[in-house]
Protein backbone atom coordinates (compact mmCIF):
# COMPACT_ATOMS: atom_id res chain seq x y z
CA UNK A 1 0.00 0.00 0.00
CA UNK A 2 2.77 2.40 0.82
CA UNK A 3 4.62 1.90 -2.43
CA UNK A 4 1.50 2.55 -4.30
CA UNK A 5 1.00 5.75 -2.53
CA UNK A 6 4.52 6.78 -3.30
CA UNK A 7 4.17 5.77 -6.82
CA UNK A 8 1.02 7.77 -7.25
CA UNK A 9 2.57 11.13 -6.53
CA UNK A 10 5.58 10.26 -8.56
CA UNK A 11 3.35 9.30 -11.45
CA UNK A 12 1.45 12.48 -11.05
CA UNK A 13 4.63 14.42 -10.97
CA UNK A 14 6.01 12.83 -14.04
CA UNK A 15 3.59 14.52 -16.42
CA UNK A 16 4.55 17.76 -14.89
CA UNK A 17 8.26 17.19 -15.01
CA UNK A 18 8.56 19.55 -17.86
CA UNK A 19 7.02 22.38 -15.91
CA UNK A 20 9.03 21.73 -12.69
CA UNK A 21 11.40 24.53 -13.41
CA UNK A 22 8.59 27.02 -13.97
CA UNK A 23 6.76 25.99 -10.75
CA UNK A 24 9.86 26.17 -8.48
CA UNK A 25 9.12 29.65 -7.26
CA UNK A 26 5.50 28.99 -6.07
CA UNK A 27 6.64 25.79 -4.36
CA UNK A 28 9.13 27.76 -2.31
CA UNK A 29 6.37 30.13 -1.19
CA UNK A 30 4.25 27.18 -0.23
CA UNK A 31 7.14 25.66 1.66
CA UNK A 32 7.52 28.92 3.47
CA UNK A 33 3.87 28.96 4.29
CA UNK A 34 4.09 25.38 5.48
CA UNK A 35 7.09 26.23 7.57
CA UNK A 36 5.20 29.10 9.13
CA UNK A 37 2.29 26.82 9.79
CA UNK A 38 4.67 24.25 11.24
CA UNK A 39 6.21 26.82 13.52
CA UNK A 40 2.79 28.05 14.59
CA UNK A 41 1.59 24.54 15.26
CA UNK A 42 4.81 23.78 17.17
CA UNK A 43 4.19 26.81 19.34
CA UNK A 44 0.60 25.79 19.90
CA UNK A 45 1.76 22.27 20.75
CA UNK A 46 4.27 23.64 23.24
CA UNK A 47 1.58 25.83 24.73
CA UNK A 48 -0.74 22.87 25.04
CA UNK A 49 2.01 20.80 26.63
CA UNK A 50 2.69 23.56 29.11
CA UNK A 51 -1.03 23.85 29.88
CA UNK A 52 -1.18 20.08 30.29
CA UNK A 53 1.78 20.19 32.64
CA UNK A 54 0.17 23.02 34.59
CA UNK A 55 -3.11 21.12 34.79
CA UNK A 56 -1.23 18.07 36.01
CA UNK A 57 0.52 20.13 38.64
CA UNK A 58 -2.79 21.66 39.70
CA UNK A 59 -4.33 18.22 39.84
CA UNK A 60 -1.48 16.98 42.05
CA UNK A 61 -1.88 20.08 44.24
CA UNK A 62 -5.60 19.49 44.48
CA UNK A 63 -4.95 15.87 45.43
CA UNK A 64 -2.61 17.01 48.19
CA UNK A 65 -5.17 19.57 49.36
CA UNK A 66 -7.85 16.90 49.41
CA UNK A 67 -5.63 14.65 51.51
CA UNK A 68 -4.88 17.56 53.86
CA UNK A 69 -8.56 18.45 54.16
CA UNK A 70 -9.44 14.85 54.90
CA UNK A 71 -6.75 14.78 57.60
CA UNK A 72 -7.99 18.07 59.02
CA UNK A 73 -11.57 16.82 59.01
CA UNK A 74 -10.47 13.75 60.87
CA UNK A 75 -8.55 15.83 63.40
CA UNK A 76 -11.45 18.26 63.80
CA UNK A 77 -13.87 15.40 64.38
CA UNK A 78 -11.60 13.95 67.05
CA UNK A 79 -11.21 17.44 68.59
CA UNK A 80 -14.94 18.04 68.60
CA UNK A 81 -15.59 14.71 70.28
CA UNK A 82 -12.90 15.38 72.86
CA UNK A 83 -14.24 18.90 73.46
CA UNK A 84 -17.75 17.63 73.91
CA UNK A 85 -16.47 15.22 76.51
CA UNK A 86 -14.52 18.00 78.24
CA UNK A 87 -17.53 20.29 78.25
CA UNK A 88 -19.66 17.64 79.84
CA UNK A 89 -17.06 17.07 82.52
CA UNK A 90 -16.58 20.84 82.94
CA UNK A 91 -20.29 21.36 83.54
CA UNK A 92 -20.16 18.84 86.32
CA UNK A 93 -17.07 20.47 87.84
CA UNK A 94 -18.53 24.02 87.57
CA UNK A 95 -21.68 22.95 89.39
CA UNK A 96 -19.63 21.60 92.25
CA UNK A 97 -17.43 24.74 92.29
CA UNK A 98 -20.46 27.00 92.34
CA UNK A 99 -21.90 25.16 95.30
CA UNK A 100 -18.62 25.49 97.21
CA UNK A 101 -18.38 29.21 96.37
CA UNK A 102 -21.97 29.82 97.45
CA UNK A 103 -21.36 28.14 100.79
CA UNK A 104 -18.24 30.26 101.31
CA UNK A 105 -20.14 33.44 100.40
CA UNK A 106 -22.87 32.63 102.94
CA UNK A 107 -20.24 32.14 105.62
CA UNK A 108 -18.50 35.42 104.79
CA UNK A 109 -21.88 37.19 104.79
CA UNK A 110 -22.61 35.94 108.27
CA UNK A 111 -19.21 37.11 109.50
CA UNK A 112 -19.61 40.56 107.90
CA UNK A 113 -23.13 40.91 109.34
CA UNK A 114 -21.86 40.19 112.85
CA UNK A 115 -18.97 42.62 112.35
CA UNK A 116 -21.14 45.43 111.04
CA UNK A 117 -23.70 44.90 113.79
CA UNK A 118 -20.92 45.59 116.32
CA UNK A 119 -19.80 48.68 114.37
CA UNK A 120 -23.39 49.87 114.11
CA UNK A 121 -23.70 49.73 117.87
CA UNK A 122 -20.47 51.72 118.27
CA UNK A 123 -21.53 54.37 115.74
CA UNK A 124 -24.96 54.65 117.35
CA UNK A 125 -23.29 55.23 120.72
CA UNK A 126 -21.02 57.91 119.18
CA UNK A 127 -24.04 59.55 117.56
CA UNK A 128 -25.82 59.73 120.87
CA UNK A 129 -22.73 61.23 122.45
CA UNK A 130 -22.44 63.82 119.69
CA UNK A 131 -26.11 64.75 120.09
CA UNK A 132 -25.53 65.23 123.79
CA UNK A 133 -22.50 67.42 123.08
CA UNK A 134 -24.48 69.39 120.49
CA UNK A 135 -27.19 70.05 123.05
CA UNK A 136 -24.56 71.12 125.56
CA UNK A 137 -22.94 73.41 122.99
CA UNK A 138 -26.31 74.96 122.16
CA UNK A 139 -26.87 75.64 125.84
CA UNK A 140 -23.41 77.20 126.10
CA UNK A 141 -24.12 79.35 123.04
CA UNK A 142 -27.29 80.60 124.67
CA UNK A 143 -25.30 81.36 127.78
CA UNK A 144 -22.64 83.20 125.66
CA UNK A 145 -25.18 85.33 123.86
CA UNK A 146 -24.18 88.48 125.84
CA UNK A 147 -20.58 87.87 124.88
CA UNK A 148 -21.69 87.75 121.27
CA UNK A 149 -23.08 91.23 121.62
CA UNK A 150 -19.81 92.29 123.18
CA UNK A 151 -18.00 90.63 120.30
CA UNK A 152 -20.06 92.61 117.82
CA UNK A 153 -19.24 95.80 119.68
CA UNK A 154 -15.56 94.88 119.69
CA UNK A 155 -15.69 94.11 115.99
CA UNK A 156 -17.26 97.50 115.35
CA UNK A 157 -14.52 99.12 117.48
CA UNK A 158 -11.88 97.17 115.54
CA UNK A 159 -13.32 98.39 112.24
CA UNK A 160 -13.29 101.97 113.52
CA UNK A 161 -9.70 101.57 114.66
CA UNK A 162 -8.77 100.09 111.30
CA UNK A 163 -10.31 103.09 109.53
CA UNK A 164 -8.44 105.41 111.89
CA UNK A 165 -5.24 103.45 111.26
CA UNK A 166 -5.76 103.78 107.52
CA UNK A 167 -6.31 107.53 107.94
CA UNK A 168 -3.14 107.79 110.05
CA UNK A 169 -1.20 105.83 107.45
CA UNK A 170 -2.39 108.22 104.75
CA UNK A 171 -1.40 111.21 106.87
CA UNK A 172 1.96 109.58 107.67
CA UNK A 173 2.55 108.93 103.97
CA UNK A 174 1.73 112.55 103.13
CA UNK A 175 4.03 113.73 105.91
CA UNK A 176 6.80 111.48 104.61
CA UNK A 177 6.32 112.89 101.12
CA UNK A 178 6.50 116.45 102.44
CA UNK A 179 9.62 115.65 104.48
CA UNK A 180 11.20 113.89 101.51
CA UNK A 181 10.38 116.84 99.22
CA UNK A 182 11.84 119.26 101.77
CA UNK A 183 14.91 117.05 102.11
CA UNK A 184 15.38 116.95 98.35
CA UNK A 185 15.01 120.73 98.15
CA UNK A 186 17.53 121.21 100.96
CA UNK A 187 19.84 118.69 99.31
CA UNK A 188 19.62 120.52 95.98
CA UNK A 189 20.26 123.85 97.74
CA UNK A 190 23.24 122.44 99.61
CA UNK A 191 24.57 120.87 96.42
CA UNK A 192 24.27 124.20 94.60
CA UNK A 193 25.98 125.95 97.48
CA UNK A 194 28.72 123.32 97.61
CA UNK A 195 29.14 123.49 93.83
CA UNK A 196 29.40 127.27 93.99
CA UNK A 197 31.88 127.00 96.85
CA UNK A 198 33.91 124.42 94.95
CA UNK A 199 33.87 126.64 91.88
CA UNK A 200 34.98 129.63 93.94
CA UNK A 201 37.71 127.53 95.55
CA UNK A 202 38.74 126.28 92.11
CA UNK A 203 38.91 129.85 90.78
CA UNK A 204 40.86 130.91 93.85
CA UNK A 205 43.17 127.92 93.43
CA UNK A 206 43.66 128.81 89.78
CA UNK A 207 44.47 132.39 90.72
CA UNK A 208 46.87 131.17 93.41
CA UNK A 209 48.41 128.72 90.94
CA UNK A 210 48.83 131.47 88.36
CA UNK A 211 50.32 133.78 90.98
CA UNK A 212 52.64 131.03 92.24
CA UNK A 213 53.59 130.19 88.65
CA UNK A 214 54.35 133.83 87.93
CA UNK A 215 56.36 134.12 91.15
CA UNK A 216 58.19 130.88 90.36
CA UNK A 217 58.85 132.09 86.81
CA UNK A 218 60.17 135.38 88.10
CA UNK A 219 62.34 133.55 90.64
CA UNK A 220 63.64 131.26 87.90
CA UNK A 221 64.32 134.28 85.71
CA UNK A 222 66.16 135.97 88.57
CA UNK A 223 68.16 132.79 89.24
CA UNK A 224 68.91 132.46 85.54
CA UNK A 225 70.10 136.07 85.44
CA UNK A 226 72.21 135.57 88.53
CA UNK A 227 73.64 132.33 87.17
CA UNK A 228 74.29 134.04 83.82
CA UNK A 229 76.17 136.83 85.61
CA UNK A 230 78.13 134.25 87.61
CA UNK A 231 78.88 132.35 84.41
CA UNK A 232 80.08 135.50 82.69
CA UNK A 233 82.17 136.34 85.74
CA UNK A 234 83.65 132.84 85.76
CA UNK A 235 84.37 133.11 82.04
CA UNK A 236 86.15 136.42 82.59
CA UNK A 237 88.10 134.87 85.46
CA UNK A 238 89.00 131.92 83.27
CA UNK A 239 90.22 134.24 80.53
CA UNK A 240 92.22 136.19 83.12
CA UNK A 241 93.70 132.96 84.47
CA UNK A 242 94.65 131.79 80.98
CA UNK A 243 96.24 135.17 80.28
CA UNK A 244 98.13 135.05 83.58
CA UNK A 245 99.19 131.47 82.89
CA UNK A 246 100.55 132.45 79.47
CA UNK A 247 102.43 135.36 81.03
CA UNK A 248 103.86 133.09 83.73
CA UNK A 249 104.88 130.53 81.12
CA UNK A 250 106.59 133.23 79.10
CA UNK A 251 108.35 134.47 82.25
CA UNK A 252 109.33 130.90 83.08
CA UNK A 253 110.79 130.38 79.62
CA UNK A 254 112.64 133.65 79.86
CA UNK A 255 113.98 132.76 83.31
CA UNK A 256 114.95 129.34 82.02
CA UNK A 257 116.92 130.89 79.16
CA UNK A 258 118.54 133.35 81.55
CA UNK A 259 119.47 130.49 83.87
CA UNK A 260 120.99 128.54 80.99
CA UNK A 261 122.94 131.58 79.92
CA UNK A 262 124.14 132.12 83.51
CA UNK A 263 125.18 128.49 83.80
CA UNK A 264 127.07 128.63 80.50
CA UNK A 265 128.83 131.78 81.67
CA UNK A 266 129.71 130.13 84.99
CA UNK A 267 131.11 127.11 83.15
CA UNK A 268 133.19 129.32 80.86
CA UNK A 269 134.47 131.30 83.84
CA UNK A 270 135.36 128.02 85.61
CA UNK A 271 137.45 126.91 82.64
CA UNK A 272 139.13 130.24 82.44
CA UNK A 273 139.77 130.33 86.19
CA UNK A 274 141.12 126.74 86.38
CA UNK A 275 143.88 127.04 83.80
CA UNK A 276 146.14 124.28 82.59
CA UNK A 277 147.36 123.48 86.06
CA UNK A 278 143.96 123.59 87.72
CA UNK A 279 141.95 120.76 89.29
CA UNK A 280 140.69 117.92 87.10
CA UNK A 281 137.32 118.11 85.37
CA UNK A 282 134.25 116.85 87.19
CA UNK A 283 132.80 113.56 85.97
CA UNK A 284 129.39 112.02 86.72
CA UNK A 285 129.48 108.98 89.05
CA UNK A 286 128.50 105.62 87.64
CA UNK A 287 125.69 104.72 90.09
CA UNK A 288 124.60 107.94 91.84
CA UNK A 289 124.48 111.70 91.38
CA UNK A 290 125.28 114.33 93.98
CA UNK A 291 122.36 116.52 94.88
CA UNK A 292 124.26 119.20 96.82
CA UNK A 293 124.37 121.61 93.89
CA UNK A 294 121.11 122.65 92.22
CA UNK A 295 122.63 122.75 88.74
CA UNK A 296 124.11 119.22 88.85
CA UNK A 297 120.78 117.50 88.15
CA UNK A 298 119.72 119.99 85.54
CA UNK A 299 123.06 120.04 83.65
CA UNK A 300 122.52 116.90 81.51
CA UNK A 301 119.06 117.98 80.50
CA UNK A 302 118.97 120.09 77.39
CA UNK A 303 116.88 123.28 77.26
CA UNK A 304 114.64 121.85 74.56
CA UNK A 305 113.85 118.79 76.71
CA UNK A 306 113.19 120.91 79.78
CA UNK A 307 110.96 123.21 77.80
CA UNK A 308 109.04 120.27 76.27
CA UNK A 309 108.54 118.61 79.67
CA UNK A 310 107.68 121.70 81.64
CA UNK A 311 104.65 122.91 79.60
CA UNK A 312 103.23 119.37 79.55
CA UNK A 313 103.18 119.27 83.34
CA UNK A 314 102.18 122.84 84.01
CA UNK A 315 98.79 122.80 82.20
CA UNK A 316 97.89 119.38 83.63
CA UNK A 317 98.43 120.64 87.17
CA UNK A 318 97.41 124.23 86.84
CA UNK A 319 94.11 123.64 85.01
CA UNK A 320 92.48 121.23 87.52
CA UNK A 321 93.77 123.25 90.45
CA UNK A 322 92.36 126.48 89.04
CA UNK A 323 89.02 124.88 88.10
CA UNK A 324 88.66 123.21 91.50
CA UNK A 325 89.62 126.19 93.62
CA UNK A 326 87.72 128.90 91.75
CA UNK A 327 84.06 127.76 92.32
CA UNK A 328 84.56 126.40 95.84
CA UNK A 329 86.76 129.07 97.38
CA UNK A 330 85.72 132.29 95.76
CA UNK A 331 85.53 134.27 98.99
CA UNK A 332 87.61 132.16 101.33
CA UNK A 333 91.14 133.52 101.03
CA UNK A 334 92.52 136.40 103.10
CA UNK A 335 94.26 139.17 101.12
CA UNK A 336 97.30 139.00 103.35
CA UNK A 337 97.83 135.31 102.65
CA UNK A 338 97.36 135.88 98.92
CA UNK A 339 99.87 138.71 98.85
CA UNK A 340 102.37 136.79 100.95
CA UNK A 341 102.00 133.72 98.78
CA UNK A 342 102.35 135.76 95.60
CA UNK A 343 105.39 137.62 96.93
CA UNK A 344 107.11 134.56 98.35
CA UNK A 345 106.44 131.91 95.69
CA UNK A 346 106.75 133.52 92.31
CA UNK A 347 110.28 134.96 92.64
CA UNK A 348 111.62 131.86 94.35
CA UNK A 349 110.14 129.65 91.68
CA UNK A 350 111.60 131.82 88.99
CA UNK A 351 115.15 131.29 90.32
CA UNK A 352 115.21 127.74 91.75
CA UNK A 353 115.89 124.66 89.67
CA UNK A 354 114.49 125.76 86.34
CA UNK A 355 116.29 123.15 84.28
CA UNK A 356 115.35 119.99 86.23
CA UNK A 357 112.08 118.04 86.24
CA UNK A 358 111.30 118.47 89.92
CA UNK A 359 111.67 122.27 89.83
CA UNK A 360 109.39 122.33 86.78
CA UNK A 361 106.74 120.47 88.76
CA UNK A 362 107.12 122.75 91.78
CA UNK A 363 107.01 125.75 89.53
CA UNK A 364 103.82 124.51 87.87
CA UNK A 365 102.28 123.85 91.28
CA UNK A 366 103.35 127.26 92.54
CA UNK A 367 101.98 128.93 89.43
CA UNK A 368 98.65 127.12 89.69
CA UNK A 369 98.38 127.92 93.40
CA UNK A 370 99.34 131.54 92.80
CA UNK A 371 96.72 131.81 90.06
CA UNK A 372 94.09 130.19 92.28
CA UNK A 373 95.00 132.58 95.11
CA UNK A 374 94.79 135.58 92.79
CA UNK A 375 91.42 134.36 91.56
CA UNK A 376 90.25 133.81 95.14
CA UNK A 377 91.35 137.35 95.94
CA UNK A 378 89.29 138.64 93.02
CA UNK A 379 86.38 136.44 94.09
CA UNK A 380 86.62 137.79 97.62
CA UNK A 381 86.41 141.30 96.24
CA UNK A 382 83.37 140.37 94.12
CA UNK A 383 81.49 138.38 96.74
CA UNK A 384 82.06 140.84 99.57
CA UNK A 385 78.32 141.01 100.15
CA UNK A 386 78.17 137.41 101.44
CA UNK A 387 77.24 136.56 105.00
CA UNK A 388 79.75 137.09 107.84
CA UNK A 389 79.41 133.49 108.92
CA UNK A 390 80.60 132.13 105.55
CA UNK A 391 83.50 134.60 105.40
CA UNK A 392 84.54 133.72 108.94
CA UNK A 393 84.48 130.00 108.17
CA UNK A 394 86.54 130.56 105.00
CA UNK A 395 88.98 132.74 106.97
CA UNK A 396 89.43 129.99 109.55
CA UNK A 397 89.92 127.44 106.80
CA UNK A 398 92.50 129.66 105.08
CA UNK A 399 94.33 130.32 108.36
CA UNK A 400 94.43 126.59 109.05
CA UNK A 401 95.85 125.89 105.61
CA UNK A 402 98.30 128.80 105.93
CA UNK A 403 101.08 126.89 107.70
CA UNK A 404 100.89 124.13 105.10
CA UNK A 405 101.18 126.67 102.31
CA UNK A 406 104.07 128.42 104.04
CA UNK A 407 105.87 125.12 104.59
CA UNK A 408 105.34 124.22 100.94
CA UNK A 409 106.61 127.65 99.90
CA UNK A 410 109.67 127.37 102.08
CA UNK A 411 110.36 123.92 100.76
CA UNK A 412 109.97 125.10 97.17
CA UNK A 413 112.11 128.14 97.93
CA UNK A 414 115.03 126.21 99.51
CA UNK A 415 116.46 123.61 97.10
CA UNK A 416 118.71 122.15 99.79
CA UNK A 417 115.68 120.83 101.69
CA UNK A 418 114.72 118.49 98.84
CA UNK A 419 115.71 114.83 99.44
CA UNK A 420 118.42 113.36 97.22
CA UNK A 421 116.97 111.41 94.32
CA UNK A 422 118.34 109.73 91.26
CA UNK A 423 117.25 110.59 87.74
CA UNK A 424 115.04 107.49 87.47
CA UNK A 425 113.15 108.30 90.68
CA UNK A 426 112.62 111.88 89.51
CA UNK A 427 111.22 110.63 86.18
CA UNK A 428 108.88 108.19 87.96
CA UNK A 429 107.61 110.89 90.31
CA UNK A 430 107.05 113.29 87.42
CA UNK A 431 105.05 110.64 85.52
CA UNK A 432 103.00 109.81 88.66
CA UNK A 433 102.11 113.46 89.20
CA UNK A 434 101.36 114.03 85.53
CA UNK A 435 98.86 111.13 85.43
CA UNK A 436 96.30 112.78 87.84
CA UNK A 437 96.50 115.92 85.72
CA UNK A 438 95.59 113.94 82.61
CA UNK A 439 92.75 112.21 84.50
Curated annotation (Swiss-Prot):
Residues 1-28, 276-439 are annotated as: Disordered. Residues 9-23, 376-392, 428-439 have a biased composition (Low complexity). Pfam families: DUF4515. Keywords: Coiled coil. Residues 27-74, 121-213 form a coiled coil. Residues 338-365 have a biased composition (Polar residues). This is Coiled-coil domain-containing protein 166.
Amino acid sequence: MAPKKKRGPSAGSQPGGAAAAGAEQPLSERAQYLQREHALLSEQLDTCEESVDQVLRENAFLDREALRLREENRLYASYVSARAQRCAKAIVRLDEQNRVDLAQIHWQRAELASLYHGREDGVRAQLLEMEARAAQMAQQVQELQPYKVLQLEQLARIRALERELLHMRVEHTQLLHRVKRRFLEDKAAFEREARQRVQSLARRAEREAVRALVAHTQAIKADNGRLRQELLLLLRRTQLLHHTRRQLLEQREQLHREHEDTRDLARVHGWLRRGPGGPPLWERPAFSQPTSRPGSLAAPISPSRAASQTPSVVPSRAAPRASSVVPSREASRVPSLVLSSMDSRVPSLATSKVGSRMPSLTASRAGSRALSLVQSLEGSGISSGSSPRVSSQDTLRSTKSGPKLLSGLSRDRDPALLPPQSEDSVNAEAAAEASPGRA
